[in-house]
């Protein structure tokens, strides 16, 4: 719950915290690549005011991959087929580079027909400023701050006879 409370507080607020059950890792065979794929973290929870349970799938990603959204969709489809429950997919990107914002959707379509649009929640640590989490008592914040970035502010002041200039550069 600490992870959700830190990064997805609105969603965390809808979960009954007494209902969280972590499930065993799921293994799938990728018949195209001939590899075994593992769903890293899967939890079953109840949402406040509902009797039915949902699944939360958290997939850590330590390297940038263009096919990651597609892979996460495949995991989603297989989990949905097996469990027949609503699934809240979350990716946590812990890579240092690239610094560009990661893609958080996978689409299949044609110019006049959108067949599929799969979206997922994403926490991209290199897009977060560690200083924003410094005063949090959440242990997850302490553990992940090393992978976060620092937004650096440089103030340059040049004083010349007769006038002064100040410029601000954000890196």
Language-model region placement:
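Conserved single-residue anchors adjacent to enzymatic active/cofactor-binding motifs
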Residues: 1-171
